[in-house]
Swiss-Prot record:
It is found in: Nucleus matrix; Cytoplasm, Cytoskeleton, Microtubule organizing center, Centrosome. This is Fidgetin. One of its GO terms (cellular component) is centrosome. Residues 221-232, 266-289 have a biased composition (Pro residues).
C-alpha cells in the first residue's frame, strides 16, 4: 500500500519500506547502543506511528495523542550522557536521577578530573586534544578546519580566521591546520587592538566535548571540501614573541575622528578573564589613525553635534541651517527670529500657520515665530548704517520686531531719497497670499476685491510723502514685548468679554459668519490709569498683529498741521502690515460734539478718521481692528457712537488687583512687609486707579533714600539702603491721593448703563 501526504504543499509518496528505515540502523532493545542512538530510534517510531499515520487519517486524534504521550515519556526518560569519552567535569560517581522519577538509562559517570586526564603544560594551557582516535579516523585529515565553537563532525569549506596562543619558553603548539590556508588580511588592516597572544600561526581545532553520535560512529560522512582557493592578498606575518601589534594603515589615507568621543576603531577589548594567572592581560595600543574611509572635502563650516530631541521644530531648524550653508534657502528665513512671539499661555488665540511663503514674510509681529505677517518694507537693501539704526534694539530683546526703531525723526526732517523706494509687499508676486494670514480667508468675490484694493493701496502709498511713512514707522508703530492676559491685574470680566465678543469672531470668522458682524471697532472708556492701553496691546499680541498707537491729544496739539495726513498714512501702513491693531487714545478730542467749525483742523481730522474707520468696517479683506479709548465718553457726539460696535467700561482695580499690583512693583526693591501690612495697604488704596497705586509704590520706594544723610548719592551703593517699610507707605499716603472722584465714577456707571455693553 502506498500512501501519500502533503508537506508544505508538496506531494510526497510514502511506502512501508521507508518506515522501516530506523529499525535497519538502530535497535531500541539493544543494550550496546548509546542513549543517543535510542533517541534516534524513538524519533523514527514517532515519525512512523504518529506523524504519518495521523496525516493519512489511519488513526484517530485520540490514538495519536496517546502515542505522542507514550513516546514523549520514553524520549524524555533517556538522559544523554558520555559513553566512552571523559567529560571535563567533576560529577559524583552516582548518576543523577531524573526529576520525573523515571529510570535512568545512561551509563555510570566517571569523574574526569584526575592526574591522568590533565595535560602537562609549561605556561599556557593547550587546547583540548581531539576526542579520540575513532573520531579523528572518522573524519578526513583535511576536514579538521572548524574553528572554536563549531561542530567537529560538520566540515567547513570556508576559510576561517585561525589564531594560536603565543609560545612561552620552548613549548610550541602543534598545528592541525597545516594543510589549510589561514585567514589573511590586507595591508590596510589595523591590528592595534588585536589580542597580544594572537599570531599568524594556525590554531588546532577544538573538538566539541559532545560529538554527534552519527559522526562518531562513522554513519554519516560529509563529502570532502573543495581545495582551498589561493590567497589573493598578501597576509600579515607575526612572530610568536610579540607583546602587541600595531599594523599601520596602508590601503587608505588616515582620517581623524569626526567628533569628540567618536572612535571608528572601536573600544579596546576588556581584560581577558579566561587567561591563566601566569599570563598578563594584553595592553592595547591607542590608535593614531583611523583606516579605511575617505570623505569628500567641502567648504562648509562643521556643524557642532547637538543632542537629539522629539521636537519636529529642531529638525526643521537643522535642515534650514544646512540649506543655508548650501545656499539653497531663501534669505528671508532668517527674519523669523526677530519677530515678536505670541504668548504661550493662551494658545486658543493664536493665528494658525497657513504655509505662507518665505518671500512674503515681513518684519512685523510673527504669527508663531516662523510665519510673519506682511510687512511694509523698502524694495532696495538697507545700507549698513540704516540697518544699525533699524535693528539697534534687537541685541537686547529678541521679541522686539526689527521694524520698530528707538530712533525718533523730527517732524521737519525729510528723507533724501525719493518715495519710490517704498513698495507694498501686497503687490508682490505673492500678493494673493496675504489672504492666508487669518485662519479662514475670505473666498469667492472677496479675492477680486482684495486684488483691486491692493492696487489702490499701492497707488496711494506712492503718492504719500516719505517723511509721513517714516513718522508712522518710527513713532506710531509701538514696540514692546508681547502682553498676556496674566500681565493685566484684575479686569476678569472685561477680559472674558473681549475674548468672547472680539477675539473669537476675528480668529474664527467661519464659525461666526452670518451670525454677527466682526467687531472691528471697540471703545474702551473709564477712568485714566486703569489699563486701557495695556488691553489694546494684549489684543494685538493675541492676534499677532502690529500695534499702532495714535494719541488724540498729540494730533490736536503737536501735529495739528499734519494730523489729517498722519491718520491717512497710518491706515495705509496698517493695511500693508495686516493684521493690525490701531489704538487711538483720547478719541473724545477728535469726535467731540463741541467741534462746530466745518473747515477747522480738528474737523478735517475727524472727517479723515471717520472715513478710514468706515472703510475698515465695510471692507471684507482688511484685517484691521480699531480700538479707541477715552476718559470722557459723554463728550463723544451722539451720532458717532454707532461707529463703535463694542463699548466696554474699564473700572478701577478691585482689592485683588491692587494687591497684585503692589506685590509686582515691590519685587523690584528690597522691602520688609508682613501680611497684615499688605492687607492695610490694600484697604487704604480703595478708590485708587492702577496708575495711582504705581505712583504710591514709587514714592514709598524712595523713602530709604530720603532717610540717608545728606551726602553724595553717587557714592551710595544699593546694598547700603534699608528695606522699604510700612512707614514709607505712610509717608507716601500724605503725598499721593486718588485721582478719581466719586462723581466721575457714578458718571461712568450711568453712561455704561445707557450706551455701554452689559458686563
Amino acid at each position: 500500500m502506498i500512501s501519500s501526504t502533503s508537506v508544505y504543499g508538496l506531494k510526497m509518496q510514502w511506502t512501508p519500506e521507508h518506515a522501516q528505515w530506523p529499525e535497519q540502523h538502530f535497535d531500541i532493545t539493544s543494550t550496546t547502543r548509546s542513549p543517543a542512538h535510542k533517541v534516534e530510534a524513538y524519533r523514527g517510531h514517532l515519525q512512523r506511528t504518529y506523524q504519518y499515520a495521523w496525516a493519512n487519517d489511519d488513526i484517530s486524534a485520540l490514538t495519536a495523542s496517546n502515542l505522542l504521550k507514550k513516546y514523549a515519556e520514553k524520549y524524555s526518560g533517556i538522559l544523554e550522557g558520555p559513553v566512552d569519552r571523559p567529560v571535563l567535569s567533576n560529577y559524583s560517581d552516582t548518576p543523577s536521577g531524573l526529576v520525573n522519577g523515571r529510570k535512568n538509562d545512561s551509563e555510570p559517570w566517571q569523574p574526569s578530573l584526575n592526574s591522568e586526564a590533565v595535560y602537562p603544560m609549561n605556561c599556557v594551557p593547550d587546547v583540548i586534544t581531539a576526542s579520540k582516535a575513532g573520531v579523528s579516523s572518522a573524519l578526513p585529515p583535511v576536514d579538521v578546519s572548524a574553528s572554536i565553537g563549531s561542530s567537529p563532525g560538520v566540515a567547513s569549506n570556508l576559510t576561517e580566521p585561525s589564531y594560536s596562543s603565543s609560545t612561552c619558553g620552548s613549548h610550541t603548539v602543534p598545528s592541525l591546520h597545516a594543510g589549510l590556508p589561514s585567514q589573511e588580511y590586507a595591508p590596510g588592516y589595523n591590528g592595534s587592538y588585536l589580542h597580544s597572544t594572537y599570531s599568524s600561526q594556525a590554531t588546532p581545532a577544538l573538538p566539541s566535548p559532545h560529538p554527534s553520535p552519527l559522526h562518531s560512529s562513522g554513519l554519516l560522512q560529509p563529502p570532502p571540501p573543495p581545495p582551498p582557493p589561493p590567497a589573493l592578498v598578501p597576509g600579515y606575518n607575526g612572530t610568536s614573541n610579540l607583546s602587541s601589534y600595531s599594523y599601520p594603515s596602508a590601503s587608505y589615507p588616515p582620517q581623524t575622528a569626526v567628533g569628540s568621543g567618536y572612535s571608528p576603531g572601536g573600544a579596546p577589548p576588556p581584560p581577558s578573564a579566561y587567561l591563566p594567572s601566569g599570563i598578563p592581560a594584553p595592553t592595547p595600543l591607542p590608535p593614531t589613525t583611523v583606516p579605511g574611509y575617505t570623505y569628500q572635502g567641502h567648504g562648509l563650516t562643521p556643524i557642532a553635534p547637538s543632542a537629539l530631541t522629539n521636537n519636529s521644530a529642531s529638525s526643521l531648524k537643522r535642515k534650514a541651517f544646512y540649506m543655508a550653508g548650501q545656499g539653497d534657502m531663501d534669505s528671508s528665513y532668517g527674519n523669523y527670529s526677530y519677530g515678536q512671539q505670541r504668548s504661550t499661555q493662551s494658545p486658543m488665540y493664536r493665528m494658525p500657520d497657513n504655509s505662507i511663503s518665505n518671500s512674503n514674510r515681513g518684519n512685523g509681529f510673527d504669527r508663531n515665530a516662523e510665519t510673519s505677517s506682511l510687512a511694509f518694507k523698502p524694495t532696495k537693501q538697507l545700507m549698513p548704517s540704516e540697518q544699525q539704526r533699524k535693528f539697534s534694539s534687537q541685541s537686547s530683546r529678541a521679541l522686539t520686531p526689527p521694524s520698530y526703531s528707538t530712533a525718533k525723526n523730527s517732524l521737519g526732517s525729510r528723507s533724501s531719497e525719493s518715495f519710490g523706494k517704498y513698495t507694498s509687499p501686497v503687490m508682490s508676486e505673492h500678493g494673493d497670499d496675504h489672504r492666508q494670514l487669518l485662519a479662514h480667508p475670505i473666498q469667492g468675490p472677496g479675492l477680486r476685491a482684495a486684488t483691486s484694493s491692493n492696487h489702490s493701496v499701492d497707488e496711494q502709498l506712492k503718492n504719500t510723502d516719505t517723511h509721513l511713512i517714516d513718522l508712522v514707522t518710527n513713532e506710531i508703530i509701538t514696540q514692546g514685548p508681547p502682553v498676556d492676559w496674566s500681565d493685566i491685574a484684575g479686569l476678569d470680566l472685561v477680559k472674558a468679554v473681549i475674548k468672547e465678543e472680539v477675539l473669537w469672531p476675528v480668529l474664527r470668522s467661519d464659525a461666526f459668519s452670518g451670525l454677527t458682524a466682526l467687531p472691528r471697532s471697540i471703545l474702551l472708556f473709564g477712568p485714566r490709569g486703569t489699563g486701557k492701553t495695556l488691553l489694546g496691546r494684549c489684543i494685538a499680541s493675541q492676534l499677532g498683529a502690529t500695534f499702532f498707537k495714535i494719541a488724540g491729544s498729540g494730533l490736536v496739539a503737536k501735529w495739528i498741521g499734519e494730523a489729517e495726513k498722519i491718520i491717512h498714512a497710518s491706515f495705509l501702513v496698517a493695511r500693508c502690515r495686516q493684521p493690525s491693531v490701531i489704538f487711538v487714545s483720547d478719541i473724545d478730542m477728535l469726535l467731540s460734539s463741541q467741534v462746530s467749525e466745518e473747515h477747522s483742523p480738528v474737523s478735517r481730522m475727524r472727517t479723515e478718521f471717520l472715513m478710514q474707520l468706515d472703510t475698515v468696517l465695510t471692507s471684507a479683506e482688511d484685517q484691521i481692528v480699531v480700538i479707541c479709548a477715552t476718559s470722557k465718553p459723554e463728550e463723544i457726539d451722539e451720532s458717532l457712537r454707532r461707529y463703535f460696535m463694542k463699548r466696554l467700561l474699564i473700572p478701577l482695580p478691585d482689592s485683588t488687583a491692587r494687591h497684585q499690583i503692589i506685590v509686582q512693583l515691590l519685587t523690584q526693591h528690597n522691602y520688609c512687609l508682613n501680611d497684615k501690612e499688605f492687607a492695610l495697604l490694600v484697604q487704604r488704596t480703595e478708590g485708587f486707579s492702577g496708575l495711582d497705586v504705581a505712583h504710591l509704590c514709587q514714592e514709598a520706594a524712595v523713602g530709604p533714600l530720603h532717610a540717608m544723610p545728606a551726602t553724595d548719592l553717587s557714592a551710595i551703593m544699593p546694598s547700603q539702603l534699608r528695606p522699604v517699610t510700612y512707614q514709607d507707605f505712610e509717608n507716601a499716603f500724605c503725598k499721593i491721593q486718588p485721582s478719581i472722584s466719586q462723581k466721575e465714577l457714578d458718571m461712568y456707571v450711568e453712561w455704561n448703563k445707557m450706551f455701554g455693553c452689559s458686563q
